[in-house]
Amino acid sequence: MKQKSFDFFGNVVIVNFPYGEKQSEKKKFAEKLMKSNKSIKTVLEKTGKFSGRLRKMKTRFVAGEKTKEVLYRENGCVFRFNIDKTYFSPRLSNERKEIASKIKKGDNVFVMFAGVAPFSIVIAKNSKAKKVYSNEINREANKYAKLNIGLNNLRNKVELVPGDIKRVTEKLKKQKKKFDVIVMPRPQLKETFLKQAFMLAKKGTRIYYYDFSEEDEIEKVVERIKKEAKKSRKKIKILKIKKAGEIGPYRLRVRVDFLIL
């Protein structure tokens, strides 16, 4: 039997159908899925991978209500966003919860590549952080981030700092902003953006850096971090290396936690 993979987004489910499956079979499967789970109102088919720096995904309507607007809940938070216009991964739910559990009372937190603000909001809602600053380049994602901050009653705790991370970093540097925690759920890009993180770090800053690697090449991710730290004249201590999920055959999302000394 051909395998299907799913991503559940509350009222919407995205199915990755096997190549060549007939449309009638897809519709039949989608209707069966909605019947077995009443919370699912819409079934979409994934037609392309996340692409570009804005990490947009392509989907096609299969059955149910004709919408790509999602209402999704996790970790005591609620999120609204458009599947095709913004990036969101429900598979990172446990990662978000784990990072929130590492935040100390009074921490100032900076989240890069924040999307519709899931990391920022989960951290703000589930920790005693003083303030969470949320950066994203995608304008559409920032609109939803603003909406989500309001939906979760966090206007006093989460601040949007939208725009290109390089320009935002320069602006924050001029304001002499330094952070206790920097979270970097990076897209699959060649550039690490660690230079920008180091510019906003101080002695004692904890950085949670995400990268992608073949299963047998995780050490290369660590070496890249050490190399970037040396370039920025920062001494670091690696605290933890974690396999944070598979994104393909033998290819992993990796999280490296490290401390600025």
Per-region residue spans from a language model:
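SAM-dependent transferase fold signal centered on methyltransferase-like domains
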Residues: M1-L261
